[in-house]
From Swiss-Prot:
The protein, known as: tRNA dimethylallyltransferase
Stored NCBIfam families: miaA
Subunit structure comment from the entry: Monomer.
UniProt KW keywords: ATP-binding, Magnesium, Nucleotide-binding, Transferase, tRNA processing
Site entry (Interaction with substrate tRNA), positions: T100, R122
Organism the protein comes from: Deinococcus geothermalis (strain DSM 11300 / CIP 105573 / AG-3a)
One BP term from GO: tRNA modification
Known role: Catalyzes the transfer of a dimethylallyl group onto the adenine at position 37 in tRNAs that read codons beginning with uridine, leading to the formation of N6-(dimethylallyl)adenosine (i(6)A).
Cofactor or coenzyme needed: Mg(2+)
Length: 304
């Protein structure tokens, strides 16, 4: 079986636009690999493809759960592999598109063979998080395994899970080995020169705030309180707290745009680090990635 193409790039780089163009040209079906577009109602702040775009190119793994639910990497991997198998069974070509490192790694490397959850230990770690803060817990991880600290991407839920396993077993989730992946993948990664990517992030942030992001954040707050501990998964999405503050009148839109842009730039740097260190791929320019994908989809790679 030929490898499944996988397209990744940092946030705001334009991977969805490239996927749509290729999807229309080659009749592809997109398998989304994003931790927050899985949630119904998180549309503007996640830059989710619009209904019109999805009518042109079928997308899978969008709008699959309510914002009140948790959605983890194991659940994603099972759903994504099922969607890929379905697309292939119908004689079509799936294209995995996304920037969530944990999801991409789970597809490419396989799911970690991690012990089941320990509710009592998790509660202890969550209490630690509330009392000491995320930086203290990340420092504990880094002292034992610096690479693991980078891999966790400052995600509180992942940090809690990592320490839950580590304090019980002396090993982190990624140290238990992996279940073999269901498919082989051919990775295509791209980025822009950093000043250009920064400008794209800033412009997109302002556009999303003007398009109704504050109202979307206010709706989310009605569904899931943002101040719960541990922090709800949906409120880990970039920018929603700032957008909510704009709606509440406690933060002006320009200040919110600056804060969101800064956080998004930091996230983009982590994404690029992940691609290089965890996926072992060096990003190329957008045009180089597009040319390579066209060559692959035209038959060179699909016949491998």
């Amino acid at each position: 079986m030929p490898p499944v193409p996988l397209l990744t790039a940092p946030t705001a780089a334009g991977k969805s636009a490239l996927a749509l163009a290729l999807g229309r040209q080659f009749g592809l079906e997109v398998i989304a690999a994003d931790a927050f577009t899985v949630y119904r109602g998180l549309d503007i702040g996640t830059a989710k493809p619009t209904p019109a775009e999805r009518a042109q190119v079928p997308h899978h793994l969008l709008d699959v759960v309510d914002v009140t639910e948790d959605y983890d990497v194991a659940r994603y991997t099972r759903a994504a592999e099922s969607a890929i198998a379905d697309v292939l069974a119908r004689g079509r070509v799936p294209l995995v598109v996304g920037g969530t490192g944990f999801y991409l790694s789970a597809l490419v490397r396989g799911l970690p063979l991690t012990p089941p959850a320990d509710p009592q230990m998790r509660a202890e770690v969550e209490a630690d998080l509330a009392a000491r803060g995320l930086d203290a817990l990340l420092a504990e991880v880094a002292a034992a395994n610096p690479a693991e600290a980078v891999r966790l991407e400052r995600n509180p839920r992942r940090v809690v899970r990592a320490l839950e396993v580590y304090r019980r077993t002396g090993r982190f989730p990624g140290e238990f080995g992996y279940r073999p992946p269901a498919f082989r993948y051919r990775m295509f990664a791209f980025t822009h020169p950093w000043p250009e990517l920064e400008a794209r992030v800033a412009a997109r942030t302002r556009t999303m705030l003007a398009q109704g992001w504050p109202e979307e954040a206010a709706w989310l707050a009605q569904q899931v309180a943002p101040d719960q501990e541990p922090r709800p998964t949906v409120w880990q999405a970039l920018g929603y707290r700032e957008a909510l503050a704009v709606h509440a009148g406690t933060l002006d839109p320009e200040a919110a745009a600056r804060q969101i842009t800064l956080a998004t730039r930091q996230y983009a740097k982590r994404q690029l680090t992940w691609v290089r260190t965890q996926l072992g791929t060096s990003p190329v320019t957008p045009s180089q990635a597009a040319e390579a994908l066209v060559a692959f989809l035209s038959g060179g790679g699909l016949s491998a």
